[in-house]
Regions:
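Hydrophobic transmembrane alpha-helix bundles
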Residues: 1, 68-72, 101-109
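Active-site metal-coordination/substrate-binding segment of hydrolases
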Residues: 81-129
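N-terminal helical capping/dimerization or prosegment-like subdomains
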Residues: 2-94
Length: 129
């Protein structure tokens, strides 16, 4: 059986883009001034982790939040595991932006992402059903 991945993505484009935009809109800058027992890197990274795991769970993956330091999700059964390591926190956006650095923009039919947001986009692609 051959799968036309482009056609499958095109069928789901609007929903996929909304999921991606939801993750990209989260300001997940590390904020050591707000670190506590429930927010080891500040509230932003925890919010991004919770959102990411919620997407994975919604799509049928078994998820686990490890004390807000990390999370994982799995699908299927077996003795072998494929691990993909990534992070959802970002460097501070700084100043000088023409637009909100946490609001994705489509320009000329293309999704424009700032460099630090590409990290989140890569994690999101892993969870696509």
């Amino acid at each position: 059986m051959t799968i036309d991945f482009r056609a499958e993505v095109d069928k789901r484009k609007d929903a996929l883009m909304e999921d991606l935009f939801g993750l990209l809109r989260i300001n997940s800058e590390r904020d050591d001034s707000k670190v506590d027992d429930k927010h080891p890197f500040g509230p932003g990274p925890v919010k991004a982790l919770e959102h990411f795991l919620a997407l994975a769970e919604r799509d049928g993956y078994k998820t686990r939040n490890i004390d807000n330091y990390a999370g994982d999700f799995e699908f299927g059964q077996g003795d072998e595991v494929l691990g993909i390591f990534a992070h959802l926190d970002v460097v501070p956006a700084g100043s000088g932006w023409d637009t909100d650095p946490y609001e994705p923009v489509i320009k000329d039919g293309k999704l424009m992402l700032v460099g630090h947001q590409m990290i989140k986009a890569q994690q999101w692609l892993v969870t696509m059903p």
